Amino acid sequence: MKTTVTTSVGGKQITIETGRLAKQADGAALVSSGNNMVLVTATSSKKASELDFFPLTVEYIEKFYATGKIPGGYFKREAKPTNDAVLIARLIDRPIRPVFPEGYRHETQIVATVLSADGAFPLEILASLGASAALHCSDIPFNGPTAAVQIARVDGQFVANPTPQQMEKSDMDMIVAGTRNGLLMVEGETKFISEADALAALKFGHQSLIPLLNAQDELREKAGSVAKRAFTAPSIDADFKAKAESLLRPKIAAALSIKEKQDRYAAANEAAAEAEKALLADIADKELLKQRKKELNSIVEDLKYQEARSMILDRAVRIDGRDVKTVRPIANEVGILPRAHGSGLFTRGETQVLGTVTLGTADDEQMVDSLLGLQKRKFMLHYNFPPYSVGEVGRMSGTSRREIGHGNLAERAIKAVLPDFEKFPYTIRIVSEVLESNGSSSMGTVCSGIMALLDAGVPLKGNVAGVAMGLIKEGDRVAVLTDILGDEDHLGDMDFKVAGSPAGITALQMDIKIDSVSFEVMEQALAQAKEGRAHILNEMEKVMKVPRGQISEFAPRIETIKIKPDKIREVIGSGGKVIRGITEATGVKIEIQDDGTINIASADPEATKKAIAMINDIIAEAEVGKTYKGRIVKIAEFGAFVEILPNTQGLLHISEISNERVRAVSDVLKEGEIIDVKVLEVDRSGRVKLSRKALLQ
């Protein structure tokens, strides 16, 4: 039976419907606002998996029919998800994952399908709402509901779920997700806002999503409040657990006191191997042996979790010996790659990232065929996380969702300081190569990227750095950690990344593993993050603070000239003939914009100079009183037509040919002849009157 509820956020009506579509899924919700509709389904296996983690997958699918379009390409159907679709899938996943009950191991899949879109409402908000609503109304164990809103600030006022027009005027673009208890996820970019403004935006976001939570509760009640299915969480034999913990606890505690990551892992693995030999050697039953091995691995991880957190809360000492606020040692280098246009190596503790910058022309822009039309991107950041960066062997086939997500965060952090395209008309590509990783390689990417941009001579508006904050919370005891290790991310309760400059924040991202985080904790984390990134930025600027005076000798030089818009067609020519001729003659790349801005790119300054001269000749206009060397293109009874400039001809009347009387023009002049003429007049219609006689006097 169809059930519908309607609510409003930010003055925009949102409707959630269930019971009409996709009824064989465990849960389904159709969420709509105006002409925007997203169908979200939730399905969970009835049988528990043997994995030691919760196997949740989220798919976000954009259908081109949603905007009345047919996909491009040969096959004319939707292909693999775009980067934007992957990022939205991650936004759906991140707030719902910590809300599933502990120990639930059933394979679960969320599929969000865009059915209709006009660009007036953020689809990721509808999809996130639909995922929670589908789970909330199903029998799948889920401790929701959750909801998300997009936050902008226009003319000093916060706006929930803004329109594209409002976003153009906004100094922030943040997505906030949570429950009634507090926030679960934050993702956003800002234009140098203060920590106080960021906190105010988060509070506004939390208040704005409450109506969406109420609507889901109403929908569940109206749909019949289906009982949640029972499940059995993995358990460990109590006697075996007691023996294993007694044997392992001191060894795990000793291992966690080792500062170097690989040595620490080796010591923990050795302790686990010794425990396996001591506790499992006499087990003959293969199934029981398999079960006990799984249990032993779980016990080892639990002990790491307990001991690491105890060290921090009881003694204020972290795994690598630091206190809660200290940033790991930092080392920086620039210009280490001779042919790259810019390069920077950023090392913080056992995290090392190589950033490279390549400068290109308009031909190098990324073009993305999206639901709402073709998008052009002049700035790209690609993040690579090879398995060797964590000392492992692994497959290297394509870009992972994690790599796309981390790259996007770093891209948003850096975007705020890039020069305006009008002042620096280059396509910019940053590539981040994570060479070593032990925590916050995405923030390392921000730092190495900035140093590579400075090395490349890009005139940045300022420098930014990033730091990852962590949280350990046990009851009322709380420790906020600056510059977290990989283990602290894994064993902690929060991963809160903040990037910016002394002037303010440019990007932030938060994910938590507990039911919520208070605003007091977030305020403390933002304050510590400000201190941390100021320290990191100071270390970076010891090596390089301002851009190099010029770009790399291997980068294309781009010169910009401005012409009248009505002259553009003359430069392009019929079918592109003229502009093609210029590029073939000089080897340059030419980009023409609608406002008459022309960018000429070449590694050869002489070629650029020649191309500019050719363009100036094409667009030149006849000047009264100026002498030109022209070619006679046509003889008439009353005079001759002379081409004095490309696309510009003037009339040399028979009376202006000579001081002597001329009986016939052909007696004096011939077609193709080159003569000197003077411009006497240019009338309102652009017709040019010439004289040869004036030069003979």
From Swiss-Prot:
Keywords attached to this entry: Cytoplasm, Magnesium, Metal-binding, Nucleotidyltransferase, RNA-binding, Transferase
List each copy of the KH domain by range.
556-615
- Enzyme kind, highest EC tier: transferase
Enzyme Commission number, as recorded: 2.7.7.8
Q: What's any one GO cellular component for it?
A: cytosol
Q: Which family does it belong to?
A: Belongs to the polyribonucleotide nucleotidyltransferase family.
Q: Which NCBIfam families match?
A: polynuc_phos, PRK11824.1
Q: Which HAMAP family match?
A: PNPase (MF_01595)
This protein's name: Polyribonucleotide nucleotidyltransferase
Gene name as annotated? pnp
